Amino acid sequence: VALYELIERLQAHAASALAWFDNFDLLVTPTVAAPPGVLGDYLNRYVSGLGSAFTRPLNVTGQPAMSIPLGWPDDGLPRGVQLVAAYGREDLLVRVASALEEAAPWSHRKPAL
């Protein structure tokens, strides 16, 4: 595949993904596709795709996104959600993240290492 063809395919993918936001304000996904691993295991998760399955597509579309901790299961390790908005809607991300933190405060929590 020629480089220009790849660029055209990526641009078409981005346009399709962005059109989704014509009907919705926000997309909420897990930040990663698996529970947190042990310290030093990130490279294995990244190579397998589990570390970036939900975040990687946004590198193509260029949409604003943020990840915040939202759950703390019994293992004491935070689970994150990724908030994704349309172009130029960083304000929406910050407002929603602020409301979620107010409803379920987490800044005082620290995972055991």
Model-derived features with residue positions:
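Serine-dependent amide/ester hydrolase catalytic core
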Residues: 1-60, 110-113
